[in-house]
Amino acid sequence: MARCDVLVSADWAESNLHAPKVVFVEVDEDTSAYDRDHIAGAIKLDWRTDLQDPVKRDFVDAQQFSKLLSERGIANEDTVILYGGNNNWFAAYAYWYFKLYGHEKVKLLDGGRKKWELDGRPLSSDPVSRPVTSYTASPPDNTIRAFRDEVLAAINVKNLIDVRSPDEFSGKILAPAHLPQEQSQRPGHIPGAINVPWSRAANEDGTFKSDEELAKLYADAGLDNSKETIAYCRIGERSSHTWFVLRELLGHQNVKNYDGSWTEYGSLVGAPIELGS
């Protein structure tokens, strides 16, 4: 898949802010970032309240996703440009959702909010609303989603990529250092997993590294291209960034995101765990 099929540059974005059938959507770890300022005309998706089921641990189903996008003014035929802070961390998570529910025209703004701000491009604090649509999501494409039992069966059979920090991988901490150290019952990693922190795929300005650099990054870590791959992190958001790199940029077709990730796996009774690097 060519990069232009899944990425747009900041120059392209600034030239197409008001293009018909193009919708800019901001998704951030810091859900208040959009409220301070955002790309003019962009709408907000809150990863906690919009994309997660309010009761059970799962993301919104197809009906809920359809309702959400209809209310936000996104149509099935629109080209959705996702962006956010911190190397498009949660924007990539939302990209995976859109692909899961069959949206055909969805891309990431390469560099996200970080590069946009580094370039000195304009931001707006004006409220944004769009006319309501009648969006219809497709049934979920579970060929890009891994579940617990598949992960257990994949140990020493498929590629397992742990995209968390080395300290999380080794079991020193349970979550990113800036977050509460809670949720999973045990630290460590899935046996046989290789550790390639997700952020190593990005340049200093938040853009993705070249295909050649990315291929070398995973090859040097021991990724076997002949095997299927499952990526995981803590709750599935950082691993969606790695899923994007492997599948959408490098063209690996058999790649899944395990969104249950360590908060599920690290609390399973009897599941094998390794400590150390």
From Swiss-Prot:
One of its GO terms (cellular component) is cytosol. GO terms for molecular function: thiosulfate-cyanide sulfurtransferase activity. Its EC number is 2.8.1.1. The active site is at C233 (cysteine persulfide intermediate). Residues 18-125, 154-274 form the Rhodanese domain. It catalyses: thiosulfate + hydrogen cyanide = thiocyanate + sulfite + 2 H(+). SUPFAM superfamilies: Rhodanese/Cell cycle control phosphatase. It holds the Pfam family Rhodanese. Gene3D superfamilies: Rhodanese-like domain. SMART domains: RHOD (SM00450). Keywords: Repeat, Transferase. Substrate binds at R238. Contains two rhodanese domains with different primary structures but with near identical secondary structure conformations suggesting a common evolutionary origin. Only the C-terminal rhodanese domain contains the catalytic cysteine residue. May be a sulfotransferase involved in the formation of thiosulfate. This is Putative thiosulfate sulfurtransferase.
